[in-house]
From Swiss-Prot:
Residues 47-97, 136-357, 374-395 are annotated as: Disordered. GO terms for cellular component: membrane; nuclear envelope; nuclear inner membrane. Residues 717-736 bind DNA. It is a multi-pass membrane protein. Residues 348-357 have a biased composition (Gly residues). Residues 53-62, 72-85 have a biased composition (Low complexity). This is Inner nuclear membrane protein Man1. Interacts with SMAD1, SMAD2, SMAD3 and SMAD5. Binds to both phosphorylated and unphosphorylated R-SMADS. Residues 7-51 form the LEM domain. CDD domains: RRM_Man1. Signal peptide: none annotated. The modification Phosphothreonine is found at T893.
Length: 921
């Protein structure tokens, strides 16, 4: 009867109740629609039946649990099969993900002897994580709630906490103590805890008051007592004798990575529940679990796994906070925390832990359990379940890559998996961990380097860091790459500067070049001179050339006003050098005059442009190659280059000014043209309105003087500025507007030019009247910045199509639909249009046959002016569209405009015709 009632109850649930019930069972449902509701109801019915079966099995198991404390287990296979509710092999992930595996694992957990302790532990969840249905969900719910993470006050049992992950709210009633169990004395005396520093502590004088979750802790402690008595005797060895193993016992969630959600509400719900950050760890932890099928075979159980498992659960009971067996505490705290815990634990009394010897939770640096910014650095809960995953310090301590509980593995030097004894590589104590012997894998070291060496990043950066791990770029490489271009540019500039300076320095010493020219006289006269006179003549030319070059150089550098040297001064200069030079001076001068080539010395008469015909006409000698010092040449070159650069810049500025002025003139002409057209439209509206008023009131004159129309349209302060626009509008009306006739009338005793509106026929008036709902052109052109390159979905959401406050009547939305169909008249893929009549943003929803048709409609509508409003379009997901408009599921017939006249496009045709007429005129 109860089963029938439970089966029929889901049919009467509302959408909200159905959603909450599925969430209570650990599922992550999507939107409840007509198509998904039957699937969700069937799933809820099945889960309720499994829940009732588990409750019945738990009650039967609790009655048979009387003498379980003295029972022994025969082998490690039985041990691992019962401790975690008969979980499958580590590689059998498909079994964990299936609903059948969920029910069978839960049932086997209820039947195991460990599942029903003296306090009656709750049912163990099979998969250890939520089941994600194959629908698009609005939430990502892969992490327990803060209440469940707190563990009921910080001391909740492991199985109770694991059960809270999936079957929330299920608690079996406590069973009476068994006859074979110890009922007197302190719990610490009965359980005989072995602290991880190796010394047994006496129990405290008084038991600690139980916390909110102490009942579940006591149940797990009783179970561990029975487990500890049946373990191998080697388990009594101290924990530091064992090797620290990098045991990654993590398995991926039962909801595989393909079951993702692309809903926009997913981010909002995920932020409210705090469940987004752990979900991102699924991709990372799948890679950690790939080594498990070949590394988790059962082997003889060692002291390491046996005693560490026992100490871990016992300390979690009495210490008020669980120390995870495979902690990764170094990612959340410093390495010195382990030493602080060890020193504090070595003090007598254990600090109020009820004889446990562990520090209380308050002595540990406080971190928010399950905080979103810490969650990406922590490992997600494994399917086999850890007894301390949901404790208050669980997220803090679960980041230590060593076995032994707490921070034990941090301070144990030289303990690695490659030196473990043969018996230490067995599977962990009853299903609590699976050891991964790959202690030096690259992924693990990368993870630790990320956790230890980097500060906490914001959530988007953490997501990118976890999903796209790559080698860090060294600061030295980035520094050199940053300054490489600057260094190359500086080197190039220095090279050309040095080259130019060297060139300038070489230009200043041109004597050998000139000497080469002198040695080659280019005629036969030089060969007729005797050999003894040749050397003297060459020496005279050299001396004279150097003197003239020095004088010319001093003049160019501004240190001398004399540029040339007279013939008498040249003769006196050579005479001072020696009497032999004076004798050959005339011969040298004659040779220079007759040679006619540029040998560095030029003969000049009384004027610089005077033609010399005789040697007697030569009055001055001038150097054609001034010899200037290096700094003088550099200064002259700098002045020359600066002068030329200034001229170049001036030319560029003049060109820019000319282009700017031309652009200004073009822009001004375009603006004046636009203002002229606007003025024409205003004049026509005034004349049409005046004509309508004349038909209603016969006393009005059927014409209007031009100055009156101008004064009514242009403000007094703008009339001078708008005079040119007004004159162009008047000329345009006179030449191109047939409905306006210009006449001369006497008004008030003076002659005025007036405009008379000529009434057109009724049929023509109807076609020329611009309707209220019209497309008014494109606001901007579509490009990559404002339009996606590919069509995303077949559904569109259009904004600013109307203003619900200004709309009148009951069928105004039909005009909106008709306008969209007319605008997209060449699109045969629109199958559904919905107008949200109450939307303040003027939203219209459009569904097309395919994303290609939606992209075509997007390009036609986005950025257009409609009824004075700028229309914007965005893509909408198909499932959200069907959730909003279920009737659109069956729409597959393309829609066509009902009116063939295309009234909404008449304004565009009118403007196009006006522009064409203006261009032809």
């Amino acid at each position: 009867m109860a089963a029938a009632t439970a089966a029929a109850a889901p049919q009467q649930l509302s959408d909200e109740e159905l959603f909450s019930q599925l969430r209570r069972y650990g599922l992550s449902p999507g939107p409840v629609t007509e198509s998904t509701r039957p699937v969700y109801l069937k799933k809820l019915k099945k889960l309720r039946e499994e829940e009732q079966q588990q409750q019945q099995q738990q009650q039967q198991q609790q009655h048979r649990a009387g003498g379980r404390g003295n029972k022994t287990r025969n082998s490690n296979n039985n041990n691992t099969a019962t401790a975690m509710g008969g979980r499958p092999g580590s590689g059998d992930l498909a079994y964990l993900r299936s609903p059948a595996g969920l029910g069978r694992l839960s049932a086997s957990a209820a039947e195991s002897p460990v599942a029903g302790g003296s306090g009656g532990a709750a049912a163990v969840p099979a998969a250890g994580s939520k089941v994600l249905l194959g629908f698009s969900s609005d939430e990502s719910d892969v992490e327990a709630s803060p209440r469940e993470q707190a563990g009921g006050g910080g001391g909740g049992g492991a199985r109770r906490d694991r059960a809270a992950l999936q079957y929330r709210g299920l608690r079996a009633p406590p069973a009476p103590p068994a006859a074979g169990e110890v009922t007197g004395g302190h719990p610490g005396e009965r359980r005989k805890p072995h602290s991880w520093w190796g010394a047994r502590r006496p129990a405290g004088p008084e038991p600690q008051p139980p916390a909110a979750g102490s009942d579940g802790a006591a149940e797990d402690a009783d179970e561990e007592l029975a487990d500890g008595e049946d373990r191998d005797p080697e388990a009594e060895e101290p924990l530091w004798a064992s090797r620290a193993v990098n045991g990654s016992r993590l398995l991926p969630y039962s909801s595989c990575r393909e079951h993702y959600s692309d809903s926009e509400e997913e981010e909002e719900e995920g932020e409210e529940d705090g469940d987004v950050a752990p979900a991102r760890q699924v991709l990372k932890d799948d890679s950690l679990a790939r080594h498990r099928p070949r590394r988790s075979h059962s082997k003889p159980f060692s002291a390491l796994t046996a005693k560490s498992g026992g100490s871990r659960q016992e300390t979690s009971v009495q210490g008020g906070g669980a120390l995870a067996m495979n902690d990764r505490a170094a990612a959340a705290g410093s390495l010195d925390r382990s030493r602080n815990l060890e020193e504090a634990a070595a003090e007598p009394g254990g600090g109020g832990g009820g004889g446990c010897g562990c520090d209380p939770v308050d002595s540990i640096p406080r971190y928010r359990a399950g905080a979103k910014k810490l969650a990406p650095l922590l490992s997600p809960p494994s399917p086999d379940g850890d007894s301390t995953l949901e404790s208050p310090t669980g997220p803090l301590l679960k980041t230590n890559n060593h076995i032994g509980g707490g921070a034990f593995g941090v301070d144990s030097p030289g303990l690695y998996a490659n030196s473990l004894p043969p018996g230490a590589t067995a599977a962990a104590a009853p299903g609590t961990l699976r050891i991964n012997h790959a202690n030096h894998t690259g992924s693990n070291h990368t993870y630790l380097k990320t956790a230890y060496g980097k500060p906490k990043l914001c959530e988007p950066e953490e997501e990118l860091l976890q999903q796209f791990k790559r080698e860090e770029v060294s600061p030295t490489g980035s520094f050199s790459a940053h300054y490489l271009s600057m260094f190359l540019l500086t080197a190039a500039c220095l090279f050309f500067l040095i080259l130019g300076l060297t060139y300038l320095g070489m230009r200043g010493t041109g004597v050998p070049e000139d000497g080469g020219l002198i040695k080659n006289p280019f005629d036969e006269t030089f060969g007729k001179i005797q050999e003894s006179e040749k050397n003297l003549l060459m020496s005279t030319l050299y001396k004279l050339h150097d003197r003239l070059a020095q004088i010319a150089g001093d003049h160019e550098c501004g240190s001398s006003s004399q540029r040339m040297l007279s013939v008498q001064e040249a003769a006196a200069y050579l005479k001072n050098l020696g009497p032999e030079y004076e004798d050959v001076f005339n011969t040298s001068l004659l040779w220079i005059f007759k040679n006619g080539k540029d040998v560095g010395i030029r003969c000049v008469g009384y004027g610089p442009e005077e033609d010399l015909t005789n040697i007697t006409d030569v009055q001055f000698l001038q150097s054609t190659r001034p010899q200037m010092p290096f700094w003088c040449r550099f200064r002259r070159a700098f002045i020359t280059v600066t002068h030329r650069l200034l001229l170049l810049c001036l030319g560029v500025v003049l060109v820019c000014v000319a282009l700017r002025y031309m652009r200004y003139r073009w822009t001004k002409e375009e603006e004046e043209t636009r203002q002229m057209y606007d003025m024409v439209v205003k004049i026509i509206d005034v004349l049409r309105s005046h004509n309508e008023a004349c038909q209603e009131t016969k006393d009005l004159q059927p014409y209007m003087p031009l100055p009156h129309v101008r004064d009514s349209l242009i403000q007094p302060q703008d009339r001078k500025k708008m005079k040119k626009v007004w004159d162009r509008a008047v000329d345009f009306l006179a030449a191109n507007e047939s409905r306006v006739r210009t006449e001369t009338r006497r008004v008030g005793g003076a002659d005025f030019l007036v405009w008379r509106w000529i009434q057109p026929s009724a049929s023509c008036d109807k076609t020329l009247v611009i309707p209220s709902k019209v497309w008014q052109g494109q606001a901007f052109h579509l490009d990559r910045r404002n339009s996606p390159p590919n069509s995303l979905t077949p559904c569109l959401k259009i904004r600013n199509m109307f203003d619900p406050v200004m709309e009148i009547g009951d069928h105004w939305h039909l005009a909106i639909q008709e306008a969209i169909l007319e605008k997209c008249s060449d699109n045969d893929g629109i199958v559904h249009i919905a107008v949200d009549r109450n939307s303040r943003e003027g939203c219209v929803y459009v569904k097309c046959l395919s994303p290609e048709y939606a992209g075509k409609a997007f390009k036609a509508l986005h950025g257009s002016w409609f009824d004075g409003k700028l229309v914007t379009v965005k893509y909408l997901r198909l499932d959200r569209y069907h959730h909003r408009f279920p009737q659109a599921l069956t729409c597959n017939t393309p829609l066509k405009p009902a009116n063939k006249h295309m009234n909404s496009l008449s304004h565009l045709r009118l403007r196009t015709g006006l522009a064409n007429s203006q261009g032809s005129s």
